[in-house]
Amino acid sequence: MKEPIEFKLSGDRAFSEREKAINQLYNRRYFGEVVNGKLFLSLIEAAYLMERGKIKVLDGGKELSFEELFELGRKKDDQFDIKYLVYKDLRDRGYIVKSALKFGSHFRVYRRGMDEHSQWLIWVVPENLRFSANDITARVRVAHGVRKNMVMAVVDEDNDVVYYKIEWVKF
């Protein structure tokens, strides 16, 4: 088994300056974002890669366990659990998953590479969430404006994910 790539915790992200990290994780598999020669991962990306034994994350020199990293994610985001489930499901299906905060959603999703524009915006919601029609309308309007499909990822109490595509219908 290959040695996990070392990352360091920095706020709500983990980073590595190692060229191996950039080549293996960003250039080949589209994880994270490269800024000034460093590969930055969100906590969700870091947890996903850590769970698979691809990386290890250090906080002040101490190696974190998967559970410790996950707990940090929970402290920073009360929906970390369900977002992670959706992220993991999409990545395991072979999709490329990136943040979509600037689009008012949780994730943007690419088919199998990032040569083209992303096709979907994913809004992650727990099964019992109450929301208004305006919540949906606003998200669909943004998705339509940037030529993407709006998908609601509903996570039930058994941690199963069901995807619903939401679109405008013109009569």
UniProtKB/Swiss-Prot annotation:
The active site is at Y110, H117, K148. It comes from the Archaea. GO terms for biological process: tRNA splicing, via endonucleolytic cleavage and ligation. GO terms for molecular function: lyase activity; nucleic acid binding; tRNA-intron endonuclease activity. Transmembrane segments: none annotated. Its EC number is 4.6.1.16. GO terms for cellular component: cytoplasm. It catalyses: pretRNA = a 3'-half-tRNA molecule with a 5'-OH end + a 5'-half-tRNA molecule with a 2',3'-cyclic phosphate end + an intron with a 2',3'-cyclic phosphate and a 5'-hydroxyl terminus. Keywords: Lyase, tRNA processing. It holds the Pfam family tRNA_int_endo. SUPFAM superfamilies: tRNA-intron endonuclease catalytic domain-like, tRNA-intron endonuclease N-terminal domain-like. Endonuclease that removes tRNA introns. Cleaves pre-tRNA at the 5'- and 3'-splice sites to release the intron. The products are an intron and two tRNA half-molecules bearing 2',3' cyclic phosphate and 5'-OH termini. Recognizes a pseudosymmetric substrate in which 2 bulged loops of 3 bases are separated by a stem of 4 bp. Homotetramer; although the tetramer contains four active sites, only two participate in the cleavage. Therefore, it should be considered as a dimer of dimers. Belongs to the tRNA-intron endonuclease family. Archaeal short subfamily. This is tRNA-splicing endonuclease. It comes from Thermococcus onnurineus (strain NA1). The gene is endA.
